[in-house]
Amino acid sequence: MKALLRSLTPPILYKAMHDAKMLLPRATKYRIGEHVIAIPADHNLPIFQEAHRLYDRFLPVLCSQFPATGVIVDVGANVGDTVAAIMQTCANRIVAIEGHLPYFDILRANLEAIDPQHRVTPLNALVGTGAKAGTLVAHRGTATLDASGSGAMQSLDALLAQWRERVLLIKVDTDGFDADVLLSGTATLKASQPLLFWEGGTTGARSFASMYDTIAATGYECFWVFDNFGNLMQSECGTKVLKDFDRYVESLYNHRCTGSISYVDVLASTPKTMPIARAAIEKYRRENIEI
């Protein structure tokens, strides 16, 4: 998935930056606002954010609109780059879940450096319904599920059972398995009606379509769609638009069609959280996009 995004980065820029990174030690440092975190030397985040100014910039804006009470959940927390960004714009507790042990070790070390108040709880777990199993394999800053492995899944509901605070946001980035992650948390979705943010438009169009129907029955009726560079494409649309995007992106993978979008990010809201979502979108337009 990230390979398509990489192909849209100017080749000369990508090669120069990547070659420079390969001269660095196996771990390097990257600044995210006030925090400096450790990342693998081959991690693609610095390249993408250098080339695309809106890449991974929305979530800190969204979290800045949250009340001080309530939990944020990051599934696919990687080495803690998203956590490092959002903890600077809100006061909430954060649950950071990462299934790939080498990334989890870096995540935990980063939290020791940037989270002296222990607001963030790191969990090493593979999240899902159990319909899929495997082992995570890392490549240039992202980890994908290798179905030949035997790693056991834990449901999101089970992992979050110990938290009694309302869940405000569930962010999922698991490279193609986001739908299965969310389907493992339906009790949490019903109880808290959190905002949802996931990476969509993958080869799993059918599993996503099933997930859309499930969350729609829980009250999720309004969606915002961002392209893979972080720019807003659709506001307050319905599930039909999401299904159309999924089929479009699936055609790039399965039918060798030419395209400019390799995936989309989706924000989902119930009527309960619409004021927060709308305020965040307006702030993002004003302070990030239209500058």
Question: What residue spans do the PLM features occupy?
Answer:
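Short internal loop-to-helix segment that lines adenine-nucleotide cofactor pockets
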Residues: 50-73, 117, 121-122, 130-192, ...
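Short strand-turn motif at the edge of the Rossmann-like AdoMet-binding core
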Residues: 99, 175, 199-201
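S-adenosyl-L-methionine
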Residues: 1-110, 115-121, 147, 160-164, ...
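Short alpha-helix
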Residues: 207-215
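Conserved S-adenosyl-L-methionine
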Residues: 123-125, 220-230
